[in-house]
Amino acid sequence: SNKRKNAAMLDMIAQHAIRGCCSDPRCRYRCR
């Protein structure tokens, strides 16, 4: 249960990272 909560938080952080990585080709997250 605790792991699931951590995963959700990481997913939220990843969403922010994706938004900030639109113009950076080196970023592993991309805008969709």
From Swiss-Prot:
This toxin target two types of receptors, the nicotinic acetylcholine receptor (nAChR) and the G-protein-coupled receptor GABA(B). It specifically inhibits the alpha-9-alpha-10/CHRNA9-CHRNA10 nAChR, with preference for rat receptors. It interacts with the alpha-10(+)/alpha-9(-)interface of the receptor. This is Alpha-conotoxin RgIA. Keywords: Acetylcholine receptor inhibiting toxin, Disulfide bond, G-protein coupled receptor impairing toxin, Ion channel impairing toxin, Neurotoxin, Postsynaptic neurotoxin, Secreted, Toxin. Changing R32K: No significant change in potency on human CHRNA9-CHRNA10 nAChR. The record marks R26 as: Binds to the Pro-224 and Asp-225 of the rat nAChR CHRNA10 subunit. Its main location: secreted. Disulfide bonds join C21-C27, C22-C31. The record marks D24, P25, R26, R28 as: Key residue for potent inhibition of the rat CHRNA9-CHRNA10 nAChR. Changing R30Q: Extremely important increase in potency on human CHRNA9-CHRNA10 nAChR. The cysteine framework is I (CC-C-C). Alpha4/3 pattern. Belongs to the conotoxin A superfamily. One of its GO terms (cellular component) is extracellular region. It comes from Conus regius (Crown cone). GO terms for molecular function: acetylcholine receptor inhibitor activity; ion channel regulator activity; toxin activity. Negative results: this toxin shows a weak activity on alpha-7 nAChR (IC(50)=3310-4660 nM). It also shows a very weak activity on alpha-2-beta-2, alpha-2-beta-4, alpha-3-beta-4, alpha-3-beta-2, alpha-4-beta-2, alpha-4-beta-4 and alpha-6/alpha-3-beta-2-beta-3 nAChRs (IC(50)>10 uM). The derivative RgIA4 (S23T; R28Citrulline; Y29(3-I-Y); R30Q; R32Y) has been under preclinical studies by Kineta under the name KCP-400. It was tested to prevent chronic cancer chemotherapy-induced neuropathic pain. This studies has been discontinued. InterPro entries: Conotoxin_a-typ_CS. It is found in: Secreted. Residues 1-19 form a propeptide. The record marks R30 as: Binds to the Glu-221 of the rat nAChR CHRNA10 subunit. RgIA[Del13]dimer is an analog therapeutically interesting because it is the first dual inhibitor that potently and selectively inhibits alpha-9-alpha-10/CHRNA9-CHRNA10 and alpha-7/CHRNA7 subtypes, which are both involved in the etiology of several cancers. Expressed by the venom duct. The disulfide bond CysI-CysIII is important for alpha-9-alpha-10 subtype inhibition, whereas the bond CysII-CysIV contributes to GABA(B) modulation.
